[in-house]
Structures are given as structure tokens and as C-alpha cells.
Amino acid sequence: MFYCRSGFEKECAGEIQDKATQLEVFGFPRLKNNTGYVLFECYQEGDADRLIREIKFNELIFARQMFAVAVEVSDLPKDDRISPILDALSEVEDVPCCGDIRIETPDTNEAKELLKFCRKFTVPMRQALRGKKMLTERDSNRIPVLHICFIAPGHCYVGYSYTNNNSQFFMGIPRLKFPADAPSRSTLKLEEAFHVFIPKEEWDDRLASGMWGVDLGACPGGWTYQLVKRSMFVHAIDNGMMAQSLMDTGQVKHHMVDGFKFEPPRKNVTWLICDMVEKPARVAHLMGEWLIKGWAKEALFNLKLPMKGRYDEVLQDIENLKDFLKKNGFQYKLQAKHLYHDREEITVHIQAISNISPH
């Protein structure tokens, strides 16, 4: 089972089908539009476990979470939902003992009604599973996570994921609060990207105070805000106006020029960030140009998606960018994700591994 943004089931299914085919795991996706999840039916027993081990979760773009389904339980009675779930699990072999439980729903308006129930249900369900030795006495992040996903009040899928190859977040969504002093809600996209792409233990080194960043298409400053908050200095590139609150910090230099023409005055930039409303192929190429010239060490940018053929467009743009970097002898780590705060766009992160002198 794979969670995704409602309305992007087709893209998620296409991606899973591609990954499964590469691994020679045969099956087919089952999906309904606007449900917020995709099921992949494997033809062979044990292949679901193979998929969640061998598909690298951090290489999936459209899936927020993945787990192997052990059982589907429907028609749960209102007065006792626990016993049928325990009975169904007891009949299945190969379900590992788990160290944590997440009782979730897909991220849709309809399913949100179920979340209150999920929260109340978690404590008694956890106790019952511990009583049956299906869950460890204490939470452990070293062994699998048990997922119970309710798609309707009496209907759930129960399964497990591996902690070294899943999303650490409940429902695959980081819970972030909008900062009251941020100039726009877009600030949450960049904050979420930091949580998803950069391990927390590396934040002090890679998001350090005193670094320089460049924000292409910065106005009014939602993304710049995240760098300023971390005590960085920022070249904000936009013909529009920046929020006065950011300018007052003394950490922002505003350049009223075209983002495609700007060149940093000093080549001491660590972070290049970009959320421009432009053709995705054009933005991807611009990011590649900056990186091969050594103008930035890390790039984080959004690619806007077309109305049709979204998955194909994403694949093409990322493939072209990889080819461009490879041809120029540039070594890198690349991740892309359709984040919770993204809508018709995906976010891409590239970290330079090559040590290139700026030129």
C-alpha cells in the first residue's frame, strides 16, 4: 500500500509499476481517483515484502509512505474492532513483531473524519497487540512499524514497513506549523524539504548560520525566510517587492533582476533555492548550470507540473538533468519528492559531491 496526495494516484501507480518491473516483481496497481492511496497486487507470495525492502523509499517521488499489506479487514463491528483485527493477523505467517504502531488514514477530506477515531483507537489496539506479543513492550525504532490504515469506519488494511526504508512521519506527513511572521505559506514547502531531504543530525553543518544562499524568484520571501531564520545571508532575486520584515534583518540583499540572468557577485554560495513559476525543463537546466559552474553546493527547487502527463514530464526533466550533470563530470546526490505542501509541483534536492572551483 502506498499513500499519495489525493488526485495523484495515477502518477503514484505509474511509478510503482516501473519500480516493480525493474525488480522483476510482477503485479498490477489498483486505484481509485482522489482516494489518496494505491494498492499494488503482487502475483507471487512474498513479493510485497520484497518490494518494501528493495524499492528505495527515498527514490520514490509520489509515494508518501509504503508498507506491505498482511491482511484486509472489512465489516468490523462497532462494539469490537480489535478482536477481528487480531484474529486476522494471527492467521497470517511472516508478519514480523513490530516496535511501533501507526493507525492512519489516507489524506483526504473524507478520511479526516476517521482520524479522531484512529487517535482514540491507538492505545487499546496497542495494548491488545502487546498482549498477543505482536508488538514489543517498549517502542523500538530498530524493528518494523505496524500500520493499520482505515479507509472507512469498518474497513482497514493492516501491514508493516521497515524503519530503514519508510517515512518516519505519521501518514508520511511532517507536522509543521505556519510561522506567524513568515511572508507567505510557501515557506512550509522549504521547511518540509529540509525535514525530508536532510538528516536532522546534519542540519548544524549543512544549514549553518553565516552561510550564503541565493533565492531565485524570491518575492515576497517565503523561502528566503527559512534561510534568514537559520541566520544565513541571502541574495533575493525577484523583480517584485520583498517583505519589509526580511529586509529589516540586514541579512537580505534584494536584486531586482531576472532569475535566469543573475550571477552571484562572490562565489561563496552554499544554497541555491528556487520556486519560480516557469517551465520545469527550463528551471531544471538552470539548476544544472549553477551546479556545474560551482556557483552553489546544494540546490533545492520546485518543478511545476503540467495538467496532463505529469509523471512523464517529471521523469523526462530529471533524466535530462542527470544526463547534463553526468556529461559535465559532476558527481551528486539527487532526491525528488511530491511533498505534502506541494500541489501541482514536485521538489528536487541536489547535493554536490564533486568539489568544483567556481568559474
Curated annotation (Swiss-Prot):
It is an enzyme of class 2 (transferase). S-adenosyl-L-methionine binds at residues 186, 219-222, 238, 258, 275. Its main location: cytoplasm. It holds the Pfam family RLMM_N. InterPro entries: RlmM_FDX, RlmM_THUMP-like, RNA_MeTrfase_FtsJ_dom, rRNA_MeTrfase_M, SAM-dependent_MTases_sf. The active site is at 304 (proton acceptor). It is found in: Cytoplasm. GO terms for biological process: methylation; rRNA processing. Coiled coil: none annotated. One of its GO terms (cellular component) is cytoplasm. Keywords: Cytoplasm, Methyltransferase, rRNA processing, S-adenosyl-L-methionine, Transferase. It catalyses: cytidine(2498) in 23S rRNA + S-adenosyl-L-methionine = 2'-O-methylcytidine(2498) in 23S rRNA + S-adenosyl-L-homocysteine + H(+). Its EC number is 2.1.1.186. The keyword Signal does not apply. It comes from the Bacteria. GO terms for molecular function: S-adenosylmethionine-dependent methyltransferase activity. HAMAP family: 23SrRNA_methyltr_M. Catalyzes the 2'-O-methylation at nucleotide C2498 in 23S rRNA. Monomer. Belongs to the class I-like SAM-binding methyltransferase superfamily. RNA methyltransferase RlmE family. RlmM subfamily. This is Ribosomal RNA large subunit methyltransferase M. It comes from Aliivibrio fischeri (strain MJ11) (Vibrio fischeri). The lineage of its organism: Bacteria, Pseudomonadati, Pseudomonadota, Gammaproteobacteria, Vibrionales. The gene is rlmM.
